[in-house]
């Protein structure tokens, strides 16, 4: 899998993953949390959100099983599952899930270190 394009807006997310932490944004005004990263709160419009580490555990909201690779680099990994996961600390993340996956399953984060970046994956909670 190829490395993501990391810019100044997404760097705190990727830095958190490199440290094996899931980081969401939290509004300084309404205190709601969200992902993906945005420059202002999607709920009240306030700017300058805080970065907040969360456990990363959550519940599968939806998922899809890919039987065709999105790129040649992933051709030997099909089939694989990508899920929308509602995080316990707030926010929703899209990530690969290893093993069994079903709507409503509790999942826990796993961090896969590559040469220059860290990938967030999930597996079913024991």
Residue spans of the language-model regions?
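A broadly conserved sequence feature marking short terminus-proximal activation segments
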Residues: 1-22, 115-120, 126
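Short, cysteine/histidine-rich loop/knuckle motifs that typically chelate Zn2+
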Residues: 26-29, 40-46
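Residues immediately within or flanking Cys/His clusters that coordinate Zn2+
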Residues: 21-24, 38
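Well-ordered alpha/beta subsegment
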Residues: 90-126
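Short, basic/aromatic beta-hairpin or loop at an interaction surface
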Residues: 76-92
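Conserved hydrophobic positions within beta-strands
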Residues: 58-61, 97
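Short, conserved beta-turn/loop elements at beta-strand boundaries and strand-helix junctions
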Residues: 63-68, 114
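Short functional micro-motifs and their immediate structural scaffolds
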Residues: 35, 46-50
């Amino acid at each position: 899998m190829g490395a993501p394009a990391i810019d100044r807006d997404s760097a705190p997310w990727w830095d958190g993953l490199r440290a094996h932490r899931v980081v969401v944004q939290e509004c300084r005004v309404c205190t709601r949390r969200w992902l993906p990263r945005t420059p202002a709160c999607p709920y009240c419009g306030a700017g300058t959100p805080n970065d907040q580490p969360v456990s990363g555990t959550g519940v599968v909201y939806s998922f899809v099983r890919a039987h065709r690779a999105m790129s040649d680099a992933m051709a030997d990994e099909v089939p694989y599952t990508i899920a929308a996961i509602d995080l316990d600390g707030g926010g929703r993340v899209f990530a690969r899930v290893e093993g069994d996956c079903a709507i409503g399953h509790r999942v826990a984060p796993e961090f896969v270190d590559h040469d220059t970046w860290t990938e967030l994956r999930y597996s079913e909670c024991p």
